[in-house]
Amino acid sequence: MGNTHGSKIQRKFTMEFLNNVPFNIQVPSSLRDPKDVTFSIDQLQNLQTIDDARNIALKYLHSCSNFASVWNSNTIHPETRRLMRMLIQIQTINAVCNAFYRLLDNTRIQLHADMMANAALNTKQYSNNYQYDTSRQQRSYDQRTKIFVVNGDCLDIVSCFREKYQNCSPVVLNMASATCPGGGWRHGCGAQEENLHRRTNLFQCLEDSYQQLVGKRNWNYPIPEFGGIYSPNVSVFRGSEARGYPFFPNGPEYISFIACAAYAYPSTTINKDGEMELYGSDVIHNTMKKMETILKIALDNEHDTVILSAFGCGAFRNPPRHIAKLFHKLISEKYSQSFKYLIFAIIDDHNSMKSHNQDGNIKPFADIFNEPILSLDEF
């Protein structure tokens, strides 16, 4: 009788797990080694269902040029965009779980399973009351921190930065959902966190979709209000959305991330100068506290460069000029010599030019920090 009860519990757990795996990609039974000719532009334009996206993702070699051609058109339906993103995510899961991907010429590029597993295993959650190492927090350089404001994709920027400044140790801010690992990554959503999931093995680090870390780490979501999640040496192996998510021809790069959640839809007001600001001393103080957590986690892991962004100024509708002012105040008062470089990597996308950010998100940061807006080439 006891064995029967135990078997029922195990079957229930197994079914719940199988039903929860992303896009119903079972490992290893669903994995494929796509070698066929690439998908066509017509196939992308005519995506109708998740099954369509899944079948194309697992059968065909990826053509970033075909993808970009459809993606960058003005006539594409929003639902088609969502399915195209899901197609990319399925390709990425297949690559990570296979530990390889193929280029358009059929060249097989290896992903290092041990590196990806270690990134997930060593992903660490910081609590609200985490006791930071004092000596690391007090680090100071002789020169003041150099600030850049760059119009570009955060991963493109960090790759470019590491080529130019090879002795630096950058970490990238993941503007995360507080409650849902990866935000809407399973649904083809378009914010930064979901974009990172489509280009890396972050889904292994934050969600543990395949139950590989059960009993191996002692934390869960949500992200603490004044905490964060640090993921070291995540495998990054795809380029930006605008370029069609190309697979890297020379294999993965290893980049660390800090996941921290801005407040969603905070109360705002209009100040005497006609600018939108956060409303209430508590939300202003607590937003700065969140910003400081990002910098504290970076220092705790001995990074000298942080790739930041317009924190919460997209889908979460924080006012960018006020967020820039709060970052400026925090950095100038407490962190003016704590880092070599702080880089605000910002893209004005579909969440820009709204009621809360009518001038976009890049310009307010350039104005407040009195820095030019650099392109990736200029940077």
Would you name each region that the model predicts?
Residues G2-V306, A310-F379:
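Macrodomain-like recognition of ADP-ribose-binding/processing modules
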